[in-house]
């Protein structure tokens, strides 16, 4: 229960005291609240105890006595009616189910209402008489009338208690007797359970039914009662609560029968009925039993009256004490009119027998406020029934505790708020006024977008010129250029105060998308497109948001077709509360496309929700045609016929009615057919779904939606095919039906339809395409696409179709058909002459397919015939069917009965003449409105429109106004509501015409014939802190207006940013002086002229010199300083910037500004070192912007947008650093045509000490319809392309290219790779078509290592090509040298999303970036330029994103960014919340490619997208050595990676051809033996190759063979190894090296190999590293070298019969022995083992200090080393074991180790791991004797000229020294010191 306010500030009470409010007290009755009635009393008692004590005493005593009376005691035993005890001790009260029975709930409900009334009086400190004096009337719902009658007779507190005692007695006896009179229930347990299971509640005597109309409920009752038979079982309609809420009463078992019936007729919850006609839908019904056990308001309680009166013989009510109207619940009559003896019987019957009609009661209340005292849902019912009538319903029974009488004075009265009125205009004439006239400035009648009528711009212009709102139908446009051109034509033809609204179809997503794009650009250019209407669907919230926020429209309308769609529009309006949303309702009776909905029902149900959105403009249409039929919809009176209050619409739209207007392009024959149609009324239109109704019928359109059209002969065929053919959804069954009925359908097409059957032969017989000759096809095409009697094509595209078929003939028969002509007859003659007898051949099958393809082309208007009865028959039949109504001449026989004419079944009755202009039609309607309103007595007083619409300035407390005789100041403080500019401007300029009024109140200005938004008005839009200063003449005329704004530096200073002045009242000068701290202060002057026409004054801008003045402003702002040179510089000039030094202070300032906007996690990020890559725009700013100033570039810099910018470091150069001295030059790369303007691309080159370092490219978009230069051009540096000439065909193709000029034509191309470095230059015609293409550049022979040699050049020039011939060729046969390789799983492992806000102000960035463009820092300037306010510098947004990416990758010295390219896609406004997302998306040439995006968190619009090429963290590539080989290694990559497979294949081929074995076979199978045969010629070559290999040192001057036993006479040689050949050194080494190089190739193919990275190899891995990362040896030579090395090592030592040596290798980890056991200890142990045993062993590899070493030696020594290491690991201090103790440990193991055979494999120890497959002591002194032969072998194969130091210096880390390779003397000394190489010794002597 809510407390009642004590405040006498109660608005309703005050109003009632003044007589300004009429308050009605309403009381509730029985219902679901029965179960909680005692709980309600208890809560009220807890809150108001003392105030209610006297009333509760009266009630408790009265009810207790009555309950103990003889007539009641049987019912009330054993609980009695001890109310006081129940309230003080609730647990002793009966259960809520017992209390809900009528004998108790009835008096308790009455008491609850009276108690709340009593508490209200106490809170207001009024006695009941005083309170009653403020009431206008009273009533009650059902038993609530008892409480109502009690308060009407109360004069004081005593009389109030007396009245309460009396009505409680009446209530007690009614409840008791009703309970006793209730027929006994025959409901079974099954019935009860059934209702519970169906969610209908516990079976009772009253059933709530909602969702049906009253007539539907009565039909349900009639049906059920027929089945019940006897009347004593019937169900009755007891209560009519609202239009769709009812309560039925009767025996529970009978109500169960109602439930059964309702279940059968109602719709399931998930049933979709949207495509079912409203009349045929199942209703959505809710039924619920109420906890009421007596059938109140039914004849079943007819005897209660007498019994109650008998019990009340001592009670009486004095009629004379009822001082206020008391309304009967069934009739609504005033009970004051009754005689005294009639009152009690009337009250009893009103509760027990009489049907309750609550809507009737509420309609007669005549109240402004209703106080609902409950209990129950009375309040919601009253609110529902009185909504829109101005009645405020205040509920006093809510749990939340409102101030019940503190509500507003009155609720909205829809009729008063939205109804049509007459107001006086400035001349005193009567003028229509409502929300549409206020919001759109047009009369409340409009013409809807409708194809084909409003597709025509001239028709739309005629409506606009008549002064009415109209929509251009975008559905009739299929090309962007045509759509744009027609809008521009329309813009020139409409009045200055009229905007353009385009009607778009959301059902065509592609068309919708490009039309939105066109409109967006047109708005940006100032074309007055003010709104769009979206039909055929409601877009997604994201699409709507885009339309609302980014286009610049004033309003968007939607055409919902259902309840759900209406709610979608309401949600859109709530999402965008400050944007005007139109809701156009046409429902199912409209002409053309329509829904399945009833016209009135959905609006009746949603009107209140619609009107809760003040930004919705509600327009109604369909079925209208004149004034009398539309007038009730504008006043709202139409709703009264349905029992609702007035529901006015804001406007009426006409569609079908306008098709017969004089200006409409509808053919005369079609107009006559429309006029002849009779039409029908609202009750019958739905019949058109089944049959012609009033001359109109519904068919299914090409979109599958119902559409109303005239029932012509052709349309009736359409209807028939809808039913017979198109309703068959199974394609195969439909085709079968078409085959079976082909002859009938074809005949009907030819006889009745606008699209005839195409395939007709020369004899007039219907055939198929396959049966026609080429000449017959040609003739038929001409007949059906050309209007011969008017000598024109039906559509120009059909001529293209015909010529394409002629081209097909030319290609088919290889004959010349030159200049076929313009006219069909000429074409036929020329084709026939050229083809001769071939013309009479039947079509080839492939030509039939080609012909069908031609018929289906999207760039051709859909063909006007049916080519086939195939699966596309419905498309052929229905597509593009509306145009014939405007071109009957193009129809066969000009037969209007064949065509498709849109019309509505109701609207058609109003079309009675084809000689009315649009102006006459619309004016006549509006004139009727004026006459009807003038005749209405309520509208005799005509108000002043200005006095009604204009708000006082006092409504805006934040506006401080100071005026005197010479000056007016209007200052917008930093708090308070934003002033409405129209209100403010009206106060400034007054109502009289003047130059100032024209400047401030005109919505548009004219410039060069174009209408644009008024920039002065936009600039003057006040922001917080702004002041408008108005200076007056001595005659109080305005002479000057100034806008004074804060400087934006954070201080308190302000300056004049805009000054408007006129000395003669005709010429106006507007001076913009953006508040930028430069000296001298920059400013620009705009000149205007006030054109004083009789009816209106308009503002026209003088455009002469305008562009030059703006350029001069920007020269000053950007400090370009070359105004005199700009006239002599041209588009091909080179521009230079000043030489400058990059200083620490500049970089620090730049970074400080960026840090201010950084999110919290980046505040401490402060990288040092290189210059931020985007600081390059600051360096290059002067050079980048100077090209914008050249005089030959025609542009308005106010329309300049920074579209994109990129920074690219030159290859291998070091990034810029502080201290660098740089100079920049630039040139224009492109001035290119874009659909909505011109794109200017400028490239700047930053040089450091004469070396090119960075290229900066910037795209500037220049909006507007005028081209920026006479000859647009593009200069493009094409990507480097590589073509591999890998076939004879490709060689021949290259030879044939005339544009490829070779330096040496004799040089064979086959096998070469050619690198192309080209530039393209394109010149364009003004229409954007290519006029000249020139491609030039160099061609190089390209080797895999990246080296190039000159090969030739390219020169191509053409004036007639449609694309870039050269680049197309290279893309077809080649590929870019550096390819972007997308990652399979792009993403980011760290923080990938960062939230950041745009800067609050941009002055700081403007200062550090040198970009003082005022649109970023001056709000007034930004608004003048057409923006909503300042926008953040695009480069600041870029820098913020770059900084986040820099932080994410950890680029602490800013050295890793190699390029940054950002596209700026939407403006960022100050303080916009942004979300930056980072993703690693690709690799390119070893660099990471990051995708960085920024989104506006508020709108989810992407504002910028950047690609960054970033070097990886410093990377080294390390290749492992021998010992890791295993069978099958590398084969996964071989299978899955083409590059790896190619390398394996290349090596396999080489080794097979040169050495006779397959390395793939060895790796895949690891055979124990392999025999190479030398018998064939190839075998002998292989044997010779082996013999040329040097083995041991020469004996007697001759080298022994490397393969022992091999001679010139050997016929074969067998390699064998017991563990498999892959484990033998000679094969393991090439296999391992090959696998590693293949892996590296795979990495290169993924683009992940870092350029310039360091590399090293472990032992054998060094060869793989050099092979993968350097190029001094070819791949094949390297493989041969590694194979030789393996053979050399394999045979360096003696082997036993099994091929084994006595040697091996072992890895040791000293740290596993003990913490103190380190490198020295291990070396000592190894030395002692060799010294004591004589077995060779050495530490040969030093891998990880104190953790990993490799020892080589005799297997026994290695075995012993492993065992001793195990022993030492058990010692508590192994590092202390020295000398003698170690020797003892050695000798301990000698006996055992001497017994170990060579075949035994060493086992893994605690600190040692044997290396399997290695039986050579690599890197040991034992192999020193092999050095010299190996050195000689290498010297023969490695040529000094092939070594490229750049590949090795600083990158290669050799094993021998562990330091990066160098050619410095110090490095040579280091290597010599380690190796003692004699050659290095000699080199050092030379370097001395």
Swiss-Prot record:
GO terms for cellular component: fatty acid synthase complex; transferase complex. Pathway: Mycotoxin biosynthesis; aflatoxin biosynthesis. Residues 990-1478 are annotated as: Dehydratase (DH) domain. One of its GO terms (molecular function) is fatty acyl-[ACP] hydrolase activity. The keyword Hydrolase applies. Residues 437-682 are annotated as: Enoyl reductase (ER) domain. It catalyses: acetyl-CoA + n malonyl-CoA + 2n NADPH + 4n H(+) = a long-chain-acyl-CoA + n CoA + n CO2 + 2n NADP(+); holo-[ACP] + acetyl-CoA = acetyl-[ACP] + CoA; holo-[ACP] + malonyl-CoA = malonyl-[ACP] + CoA; a (3R)-hydroxyacyl-[ACP] = a (2E)-enoyl-[ACP] + H2O. Induction: Expression is regulated by the atfB, srrA, AP-1, and msnA transcription regulators. These factors bind respectively to the conserved motifs CRE1 (5'-TGACATAA-3'), SRRA (5'-T/GNT/CAAGCCNNG/AA/GC/ANT/C-3'), AP-1 (5'-TGAGTAC-3') and STRE (5'-CCCCT-3'), present in the promoter of aflB. The keyword NAD applies. Keywords: Hydrolase, Lyase, Multifunctional enzyme, NAD, NADP, Oxidoreductase, Phosphoprotein, Transferase. Residues 1399-1500 form the MaoC-like domain. Disruption phenotype: Abolishes the production of norsolorinic acid and aflatoxin B1. GO terms for biological process: aflatoxin biosynthetic process; fatty acid biosynthetic process. Its EC number is 2.3.1.86, 4.2.1.59, 1.3.1.9, 2.3.1.38. Residues 1517-1877 are annotated as: Malonyl/palmitoyl transferase (MT/PT) domain. Residues 23-395 are annotated as: Acetyltransferase (AT) domain. [Alpha(6)beta(6)] hexamers of two multifunctional subunits (alpha and beta). Fatty acid synthase beta subunit; part of the gene cluster that mediates the biosynthesis of aflatoxins, a group of polyketide-derived furanocoumarins, and part of the most toxic and carcinogenic compounds among the known mycotoxins. The four major aflatoxins produced by A.parasiticus are aflatoxin B1 (AFB1), aflatoxin B2 (AFB2), aflatoxin G1 (AFG1) and aflatoxin G2 (AFG2). Within the aflatoxin pathway, the fungal fatty acid synthase aflA/aflB provides the hexanoyl starter unit to the acyl-carrier protein (ACP) domain of the norsolorinic acid synthase to allow the first step of the pathway. Belongs to the fungal fatty acid synthetase subunit beta family. This is Fatty acid synthase beta subunit aflB. It comes from Aspergillus parasiticus (strain ATCC 56775 / NRRL 5862 / SRRC 143 / SU-1). The gene is aflB.
């Amino acid at each position: 229960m809510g407390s009642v306010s004590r405040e006498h500030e109660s608005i309703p009470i005050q109003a009632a005291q003044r007589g300004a409010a009429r308050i009605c007290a309403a009381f509730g009755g029985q219902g679901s609240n029965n179960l909680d009635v005692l709980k309600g009393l208890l809560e009220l008692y807890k809150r108001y105890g003392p105030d209610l004590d006297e009333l509760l005493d009266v009630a408790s005593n009265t009810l207790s006595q009555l309950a103990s009376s003889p007539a009641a005691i049987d019912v009330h035993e054993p609980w009695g009616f001890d109310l006081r005890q129940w309230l003080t001790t609730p647990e002793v009260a009966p259960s809520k189910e017992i209390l809900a029975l009528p004998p108790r709930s009835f008096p308790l409900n009455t008491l609850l209402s009276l108690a709340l009334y009593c508490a209200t009086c106490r809170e207001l400190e009024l006695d009941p008489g005083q309170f009653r004096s403020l009431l206008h009337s009273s009533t009650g719902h059902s038993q609530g009338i008892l409480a109502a009658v009690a308060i009407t007779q109360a004069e004081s507190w005593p009389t109030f208690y007396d009245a309460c005692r009396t009505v409680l007695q009446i209530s007690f006896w009614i409840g008791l007797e009703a309970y006793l009179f209730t027929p006994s229930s025959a409901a079974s347990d099954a019935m009860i359970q059934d209702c519970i299971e169906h969610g209908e509640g516990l079976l009772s005597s009253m059933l709530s039914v909602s969702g049906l109309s009253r007539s539907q409920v009565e039909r349900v009752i009639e049906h059920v009662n027929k089945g019940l038979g006897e009347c004593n079982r019937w169900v009755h309609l007891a209560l009519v609560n609202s239009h769709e809420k009812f309560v039925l009463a009767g025996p529970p078992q009978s109500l169960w029968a109602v439930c059964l019936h309702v279940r059968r007729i109602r719709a399931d919850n998930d049933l979709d009925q949207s495509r079912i006609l409203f009349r045929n839908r199942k209703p959505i019904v809710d039924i619920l039993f109420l906890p009421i056990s007596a059938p109140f308001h039914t004849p079943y309680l007819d005897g209660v009256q007498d019994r109650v009166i008998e019990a009340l013989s001592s009670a009486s009510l004095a009629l004379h004490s009822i001082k206020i109207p008391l309304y009967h619940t069934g009739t609504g009559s005033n009970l004051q009119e009754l005689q005294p003896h009639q009152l009690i019987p009337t009250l009893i019957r009103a509760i027990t027998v009489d049907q309750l009609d609550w809507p009737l009661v509420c309609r007669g209340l005549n109240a402004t406020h209703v106080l609902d005292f409950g209990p129950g849902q009375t309040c919601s019912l009253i609110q529902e029934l009185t909504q829109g009538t101005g009645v405020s319903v205040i509920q006093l029974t809510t749990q939340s505790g409102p101030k019940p009488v503190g509500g507003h004075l009155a609720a909205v009265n829809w009729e008063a708020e939205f109804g049509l009125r007459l107001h006086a205009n400035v001349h005193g004439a009567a003028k229509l006024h409502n929300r549409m006239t206020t919001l759109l400035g047009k009369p409340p009648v409009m013409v809807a977008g409708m194809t084909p009528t409003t597709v025509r711009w001239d028709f739309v212009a005629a409506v606009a010129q008549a002064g009415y709102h109209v929509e251009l139908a975008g559905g009739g446009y299929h090309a962007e250029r045509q759509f744009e051109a027609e809008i521009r034509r329309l813009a020139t033809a409409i009045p200055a105060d009229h905007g353009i609204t385009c009607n778009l179809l959301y059902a065509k997503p592609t068309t919708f998308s490009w039309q939105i794009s066109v409109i967006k650009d047109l708005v940006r250019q100032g074309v007055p497109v003010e709104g769009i209407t979206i039909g055929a669907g409601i877009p997604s919230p994201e699409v709507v948001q885009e339309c609302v926020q980014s286009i610049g429209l004033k309003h968007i309308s939607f055409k919902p077709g259902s309840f759900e769609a209406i709610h979608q529009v309401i949600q859109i309006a709530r999402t965008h509360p400050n944007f005007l949303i139109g809701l156009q309702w046409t429902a199912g009776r409209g002409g053309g496309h329509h829904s399945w909905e009833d016209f009135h029902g959905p609006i009746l149900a949603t009107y209140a929700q619609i009107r809760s959105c003040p930004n919705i403009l509600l327009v109604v249409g369909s079925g209208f045609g004149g004034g009398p039929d539309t007038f009730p919809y504008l006043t709202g009176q139409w709703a009264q016929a349905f029992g609702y209050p007035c529901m006015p619409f804001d406007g009426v739209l006409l569609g079908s009615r306008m098709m017969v207007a004089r200006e409409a392009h509808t053919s005369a024959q079609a107009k006559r057919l429309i006029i002849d149609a009779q039409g029908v009324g609202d009750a019958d239109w739905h019949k058109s779904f089944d049959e012609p109704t009033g001359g109109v019928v519904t068919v299914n359109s090409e979109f599958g939606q119902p559409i109303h059209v005239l029932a012509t002969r052709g349309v009736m065929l359409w209807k028939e095919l809808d039913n017979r053919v198109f309703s068959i959804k199974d394609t195969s069954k439909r085709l079968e039906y078409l085959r079976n009925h082909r002859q009938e359908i074809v005949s009907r097409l030819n006889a009745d339809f606008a699209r005839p059957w195409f395939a007709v032969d020369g004899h007039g017989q219907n055939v198929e395409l396959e049966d026609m000759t080429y000449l017959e096809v040609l003739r038929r095409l001409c007949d059906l696409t050309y209007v011969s009697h008017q000598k024109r094509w039906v559509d120009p595209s059909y001529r293209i179709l015909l010529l394409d078929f002629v081209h097909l003939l030319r290609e088919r028969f290889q004959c010349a058909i030159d200049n076929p002509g313009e006219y069909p007859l000429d074409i036929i003659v020329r084709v026939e002459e050229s083809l001769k007898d071939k013309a009479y051949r039947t079509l080839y099958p492939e030509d039939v397919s080609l012909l069908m393809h031609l018929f289906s082309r999207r760039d051709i208007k859909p063909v006007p015939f049916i080519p086939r009865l195939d699966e596309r028959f419905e498309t052929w039949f229905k597509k593009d069917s509306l145009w014939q109504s405007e071109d009957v001449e193009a129809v066969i026989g000009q037969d209007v009965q064949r065509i498709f004419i849109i019309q509505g079944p109701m609207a058609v009755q109003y079309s009675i003449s084809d000689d009315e202009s649009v102006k006459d039609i619309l004016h006549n309607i509006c004139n009727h409105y004026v006459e009807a309103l003038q005749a209405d007595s309520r509208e005799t007083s005509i108000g002043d429109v200005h006095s009604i619409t204009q708000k006082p300035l006092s409504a805006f407390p934040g506006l401080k106004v100071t005026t005197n005789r010479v000056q007016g100041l209007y200052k917008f403080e930093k708090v308070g509501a934003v002033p409405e500019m129209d209100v403010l401007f009206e106060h400034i300029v007054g109502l009289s015409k003047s130059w100032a009024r024209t400047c401030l109140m005109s919505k548009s200005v004219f410039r060069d014939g174009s209408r644009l938004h008024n920039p002065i008005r936009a600039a003057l839009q006040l922001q917080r802190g702004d002041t408008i200063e108005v200076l007056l003449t001595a005659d109080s005329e305005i002479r000057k207006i100034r806008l004074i704004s804060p400087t934006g530096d954070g201080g308190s200073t302000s300056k004049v940013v805009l000054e408007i002045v006129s000395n003669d009242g005709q010429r106006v000068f507007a001076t913009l002086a953006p508040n930028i701290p430069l000296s001298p202060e920059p400013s620009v002057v705009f000149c205007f002229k006030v054109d004083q026409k009789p009816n209106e004054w308009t503002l026209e801008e003088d455009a002469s010199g305008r562009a030059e003045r703006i350029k001069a402003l920007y020269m000053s702002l950007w400090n370009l300083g070359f105004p005199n040179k700009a006239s002599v510089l041209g588009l091909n000039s080179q521009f230079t910037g000043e030489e400058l030094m990059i200083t620490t202070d500049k970089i620090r300032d730049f970074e400080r500004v960026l840090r201010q906007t950084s999110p919290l996690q980046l505040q401490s990020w402060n990288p040092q070192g290189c210059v931020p890559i985007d600081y390059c725009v600051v360096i290059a700013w002067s050079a980048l912007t100077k090209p914008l100033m050249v005089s030959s570039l025609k542009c308005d810099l106010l329309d300049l947008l920074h579209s994109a910018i990129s920074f690219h470091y030159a290859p291998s150069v070091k990034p810029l650093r502080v201290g660098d001295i740089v100079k920049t030059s630039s040139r224009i790369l492109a001035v290119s045509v874009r659909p909505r303007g011109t794109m200017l691309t400028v490239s700047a080159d930053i040089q450091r000490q004469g070396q090119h370092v960075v290229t900066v490219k910037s795209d500037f978009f220049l909006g507007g319809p005028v081209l920026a230069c006479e000859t647009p051009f593009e200069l493009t540096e094409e990507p480097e392309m590589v073509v591999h000439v890998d076939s004879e065909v490709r060689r021949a193709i290259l030879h044939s290219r005339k544009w490829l000029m070779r330096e040496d034509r004799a040089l064979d191309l086959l096998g070469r790779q050619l690198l192309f470095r080209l530039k393209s230059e394109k010149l364009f015609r003004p229409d954007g078509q290519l006029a000249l293409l020139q491609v030039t550049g160099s061609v190089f022979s390209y080797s895999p290592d990246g080296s190039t040699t000159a090969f030739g050049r390219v020169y191509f020039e053409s004036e007639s090509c449609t694309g870039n011939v050269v680049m197309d060729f290279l893309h077809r046969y080649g590929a870019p040298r550096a390819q972007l390789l997308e990652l399979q799983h792009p993403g980011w492992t760290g923080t990938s999303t960062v939230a950041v806000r745009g800067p609050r102000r941009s002055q700081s960035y403007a200062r550090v970036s040198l970009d003082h463009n005022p649109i970023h820092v001056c709000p007034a300037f930004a608004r003048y330029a057409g923006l909503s306010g300042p926008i953040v510098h695009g480069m600041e947004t870029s820098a913020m994103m770059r900084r986040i990416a820099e932080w994410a990758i950890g680029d602490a010295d800013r050295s890793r960014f190699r390029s940054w390219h950002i596209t700026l896609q939407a403006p960022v406004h100050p303080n916009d919340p942004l979300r930056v997302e980072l993703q690693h998306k690709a690799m390119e040439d070893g660099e990471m490619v990051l995708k960085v995006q920024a989104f506006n968190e508020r709108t989810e619009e992407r504002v910028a997208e950047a690609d960054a090429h970033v070097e990886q963290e410093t990377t080294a590539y390390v290749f492992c050595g021998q010992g890791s080989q295993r069978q099958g290694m590398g084969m996964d990559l071989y299978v899955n990676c083409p590059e790896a497979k190619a390398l394996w294949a290349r090596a396999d081929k080489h080794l097979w051809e040169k050495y006779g074995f397959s390395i793939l076979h060895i790796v895949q199978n690891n055979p124990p033996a392999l025999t190479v045969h030398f018998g064939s010629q190839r075998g002998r070559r292989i044997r010779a190759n082996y013999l040329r290999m040097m083995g041991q040192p020469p004996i007697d001057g001759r080298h022994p063979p490397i393969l022992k036993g091999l001679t010139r006479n050997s016929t074969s040689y067998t390699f064998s190894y017991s563990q498999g050949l892959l484990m033998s050194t000679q094969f393991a080494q090439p296999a391992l090296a090959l696998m590693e190089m293949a892996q590296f190739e795979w990495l290169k193919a993924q683009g992940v190999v870092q350029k310039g990275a360091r590399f090293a190899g472990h032992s054998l891995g060094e060869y793989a590293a050099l092979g993968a990362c350097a190029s001094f040896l070819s791949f094949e030579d390297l493989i041969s070298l590694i194979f030789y090395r393996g053979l050399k090592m394999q045979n360096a030592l003696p082997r036993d019969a099994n091929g084994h040596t006595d040697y091996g290798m072992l890895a040791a980890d000293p740290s596993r022995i003990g913490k103190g056991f380190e490198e020295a200890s291990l070396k000592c142990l190894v030395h002692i083992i060799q010294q004591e045993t004589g077995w060779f062993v050495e530490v040969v590899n030093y891998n990880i200090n104190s953790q990993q070493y490799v020892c080589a030696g005799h297997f026994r020594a290695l075995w012993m080393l492993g065992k001793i290491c195990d022993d030492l690991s058990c010692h508590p201090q192994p590092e202390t074991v020295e000398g003698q103790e170690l020797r003892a440990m050695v000798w301990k193991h000698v006996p055992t180790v001497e017994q170990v055979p060579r075949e035994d494999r060493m086992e893994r120890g605690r600190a040692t791991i044997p290396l399997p497959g290695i039986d050579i002591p690599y890197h040991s002194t034992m192999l020193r004797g092999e050095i010299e032969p190996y050195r000689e072998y290498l010297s023969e194969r490695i040529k000094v000229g092939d070594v490229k130091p750049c590949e090795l210096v600083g990158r290669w880390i050799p094993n021998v020294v562990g330091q990066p390779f160098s050619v410095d003397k110090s490095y040579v000394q280091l290597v010599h010191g380690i190796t003692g190489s004699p050659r290095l010794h000699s080199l050092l002597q030379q370097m001395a």
